[in-house]
A protein has these predicted regions:
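Acidic donor-binding loop of glycosyltransferase active sites
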Residues: 188-199, 209
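Catalytic binding pocket for nucleotide-activated donors in carbohydrate/polymer assembly enzymes
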Residues: 201-246
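Donor-nucleotide binding loops and adjacent catalytic segments primarily
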Residues: 117-189
Length: 286
């Protein structure tokens, strides 16, 4: 995940989250470094202590639940606004898809068109641990769809289920631990996708292919609703309790729908100035 040319310093496991602000203060000069943090453990108390040390702080958020002490709050959910937050008066906001958190490869792909005409190759990715093994259920459903000739499955690093390997066939390819370039190539080799409303959805929209999407945890629902409002996805709703038949029914509806409108909507979600916008934002607090 971390590019090889980046400098890296690892926090010892002995340093608890309560001790972390002190450790950071000892390791880094507040005049040379700013902090960008992403995780539920970086709560209001943590942010307050970091700010008391004198650091500039950027917090990547997806819940808008706690009081924020950060200098900048990033939340790329489509429908989010500053009114959703409780924060310090001088806090700046980077909200919505104008500040989509996209990796460099996908920022470049925004500039390209996808000319694929066929709709026979599925891309499946539920990321992380996939606790409900939606990957397996979707794959079984896809095997029952005559239009589907090939299935590309990308598993998250924490995926531990085994049955998916037992149904592997010559038209099913399973991938794991991919670089962003490898992931983008598999996406571009696919002609439609099934994925949750998480970061993977943003990256798929950069590829510009039809996407069946849903949510299965709370922090995905706002993103899902935003993309649904933009008519950028085929909507499956809450998929937490879906079984194979549920996914198969959605796939039949999908293949009878108009893909063009979805892809036209995807083209409008992101612009080509995201990187420039972030550079300007970060410089504003330096």
């Amino acid at each position: 995940i971390i590019p090889e040319n980046y400098q890296k310093k690892t926090i010892s496991k002995e340093i608890t989250i309560d001790k972390e602000p002190d450790w950071i203060n000892e390791q880094f000069d507040i005049h040379e470094y700013l902090l960008i943090v992403d995780g539920y453990q970086f709560n209001s108390s943590y942010q307050k202590r970091i700010k008391e040390k004198g650091f500039k702080l950027i917090y990547i958020d997806d819940l808008a639940s706690e009081y924020m002490f950060a200098d900048i709050i990033i939340n790329h959910s489509p429908n989010i606004s500053s009114e959703n937050f409780s924060c310090a008066a001088n806090t700046k906001f980077a909200l919505g898809t104008k500040y989509a958190l996209l990796r460099p490869t996908f920022l470049e792909l925004l500039k390209k068109e996808n000319t694929l005409k066929r709709r026979d190759t599925a891309f499946v990715c539920f990321g992380g641990a996939d606790p409900f093994d939606l990957t397996l259920k979707v794959t079984k459903a896809l095997l029952n769809i005559t239009q589907v000739k090939k299935i590309n499955i990308v598993l998250g690093g924490a995926y531990v289920h085994k049955e998916i390997y037992s149904i592997s066939q010559k038209n099913i390819k399973i991938f794991q631990n991919l670089s962003e370039k490898e992931l983008s190539e598999i996406m571009r080799d696919s002609s439609f996708a099934i994925a949750p409303a998480s970061t993977i959805l943003y990256e798929l929209c950069c590829i510009k292919i039809p996407i069946l999407s849903g949510f299965y945890v709370d922090n995905q629902e706002a993103i899902y609703n935003g993309f649904a409002d933009e008519n950028a996805i085929f909507e499956m709703g809450n998929i937490k309790d879906f079984d194979v038949a549920s996914f198969e029914a959605q796939l039949h509806l999908f293949f009878n729908s108009d893909f063009k409108e979805l892809m036209n909507s995807q083209n409008k979600i992101f612009d080509k100035k995201i990187k420039e916008r972030y550079n300007k934002l970060i410089l504003s607090i330096c």
